[in-house]
């Protein structure tokens, strides 16, 4: 079985990793400030002196799949002569298992004379707080107590469950590679494999990968399986990859778009959900645009887009949706006196969605009460919600028997019934 090219051509040093200069400098500065590292390495890469870098107990690298988060840590360990203790948080999830694997890795003596050890928790956003018993707590405890560098990676670091990790970690975003940078890497691989690849074909692979170098390399290996020539016609016959974008990437593309059509094009991505986008845009505009006039203009365009959405829902004239998207995407992006935006913007998770998540169980139990009353009183749920529920609430405050009977009928504790009513 052939070696996967993503492993065969994985960068072995910091200098081989392209387009991540800021992330490399921050990570190197953190290592050199808090731990031991070769002087030559620190002199070359440790350029940052930020207070938050010195105080961070761990580093959380984030970004879309395939841009080099894990590779960056591998290259760091090799460059400074550290042994890498690595585990994927999506595979090793329970607290006990995490402590066993990492604890054993830290206790065992190195056979190859490494200068130290570095722990990598890959894909920590794959943890599920309820199902994965103690996993997050175990990672937090290791960060607090371990005397070795700990690095975490995530595709989506702003998941609410990861807030405890964000609070004690230095959050570092990695950028997608540009089309030209991906093409250059693919050219080197073609040359190394002795394959004749048309530049237009490689550019097509790079374009459809949307900066996901791993995906582009995998595609190249697939196309060149059993052959030594790649043409643009080969790509056209097979069709192009359709990338999936997270909401954080969608927001980043909208706010950082250089022109109107670039922001508008985000809506053509298959993962774009305009209803979700409106919720996120409403809460992220003040984070991105600090100037009141710029912020006001962005909100004005978003509100006008929302008016079009309202008309669409009332009249079912869906052709008007395109006008809403023009305002909500291009309009919000291309505001007058738009400031120069930093490479990394810390988008907050919408409070509305957080509140809905927290109240989900209460809303489910209320729905159980409403359905029970509607079924037994032979009325609609709408009538129960509008009138009967409030009458029942008043009765329950005066007579505990009402609460007890409902609790028995629904299998819910009387305390929960009281809270619902």
UniProtKB/Swiss-Prot annotation:
It holds the Pfam family RCF1-5-like_lid. GO terms for molecular function: ATP binding; ATP hydrolysis activity; DNA clamp loader activity. CDD domains: AAA, HLD_clamp_RFC. Keywords: ATP-binding, DNA replication, Nucleotide-binding. ATP binds at residues 63-70. It comes from the Archaea. InterPro entries: AAA+_ATPase, ATPase_AAA_core, P-loop_NTPase, Rep_factor-C_lsu, RFC_lid. One of its GO terms (biological process) is DNA replication. Heteromultimer composed of small subunits (RfcS) and large subunits (RfcL). HAMAP family: RfcL. NCBIfam families: PRK04195.1-5. Part of the RFC clamp loader complex which loads the PCNA sliding clamp onto DNA. Belongs to the activator 1 small subunits family. RfcL subfamily. This is Replication factor C large subunit.
